[in-house]
A protein has these predicted regions:
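Bacterial N-terminal signal peptides that target proteins for export
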Residues: 1-10
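Intrinsic disorder/low-complexity segments
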Residues: 6, 20, 142-145
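C-terminal segment of classical bacterial N-terminal signal peptides
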Residues: 15-24
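C-terminal and inter-domain tail/linker signature
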Residues: 25-294
Length: 294
């Protein structure tokens, strides 16, 4: 190969390398970080309040579900005139491009629990998964008086040395549904802190001060039902806040009375190798109901 040919080949190689570098930077720029994902949550809430789904940066084939049913974006709660309260708790997962928010809204003067998940790809909303809980009849439990502000535990930002890895957090969080599957958190050795607590629809169901059931003041050792038919999927891991979000269907036998099952959006505060708290929104659904994303 002549010197001229060698120089030409080298120049072509440098152009290719430069193109690759620019492409990689452009791809990195498309990554939606924490603030970006929080912004999408705020945009979604603003559009919902304005009843204007067209204002959302949604993909042309966005999938939207509410209460496990596939709907057209703009249906369901979007048709109601709602207002905000002070309660908003976000779970942010930049690695998955996922943002979740637990809200307490007001509809016709009554409190409503609302939770939704957004999937962001290339600065577009591609998935919206949501649940609306209007009162005790729908939720089995309903105590909005305990959801005025985010709890101190959930608001706590763990120090870097307290945080567990993403994989460790998931492994610890799934001991909750696995414990329900066998009817014991002790049997699966769920790493619950001695003062761990659990709220469901604002009702204290486990931990210090719990009187709902006998022995519920200890989350790990309390008596729980055996829910062999439980199904679950991990939705998001907030590695900065130490929170894992899991959606569950508790399956047969999960209601206090009557037919049906309990559909649950759970979140677990995890750091220092322990589960410190669990907070969830729950809704009764007909037996055999799928999540809508199978």
């Amino acid at each position: 190969m002549t010197r001229k040919a060698i120089l030409a080949s080298f120049a072509a190689l440098m152009i290719c390398i430069t193109f690759i570098d620019v492409s990689m930077v452009a791809a990195a720029d498309k990554t939606c970080d924490r603030e970006c994902l929080k912004g999408f949550i705020s945009d979604y809430i603003d559009a919902l309040l304005a009843q204007n789904p067209a204002s959302l940066p949604a993909s042309s084939n966005v999938k939207f579900t509410e209460d496990c049913k596939k709907l057209k974006l703009g249906e369901g709660l979007w048709k109601s005139k709602i207002s905000l309260t002070d309660y908003r708790r976000d779970i942010i997962d930049p690695e998955k491009g996922t943002a979740i928010s637990f809200l307490v809204l007001e509809e016709k003067g009554s409190p409503v629990f609302y939770v939704f998940r957004l999937k962001i790809v290339d600065d577009k909303i591609t998935e919206i998964e949501s649940t609306v809980v209007r009162g005790r009849e729908e939720g089995m439990l309903f105590n909005p008086s305990n959801l005025k502000t985010i709890s101190r535990e959930m608001a706590y930002v763990p120090k870097k040395e307290q945080l567990n890895s993403r994989e460790e957090m998931i492994k610890m969080a799934v001991t909750y549904p696995e414990g329900l599957k066998v009817g014991s958190f002790v049997k699966v050795d769920s790493p619950m802190a001695p003062d761990a607590y659990r709220y469901e629809n604002g009702q204290l169901m486990a931990g210090p001060g719990c009187t709902f059931f006998q022995g519920c003041d200890n989350m790990k050792s309390q008596r729980i039902p055996t829910l062999a038919g439980i199904r679950y999927k991990v939705l998001a891991v907030d590695e900065k806040m130490g929170v894992v979000a899991i959606r569950m269907n508790f399956g047969p036998g999960s209601l206090f009375q009557g037919n049906g099952e309990l559909d649950v959006w759970h979140s677990f505060k995890i750091y220092d190798n322990e589960i410190h708290s669990a907070e969830a929104y729950c809704e009764k659904v007909p037996a055999g109901t799928e999540f809508g994303w199978e």
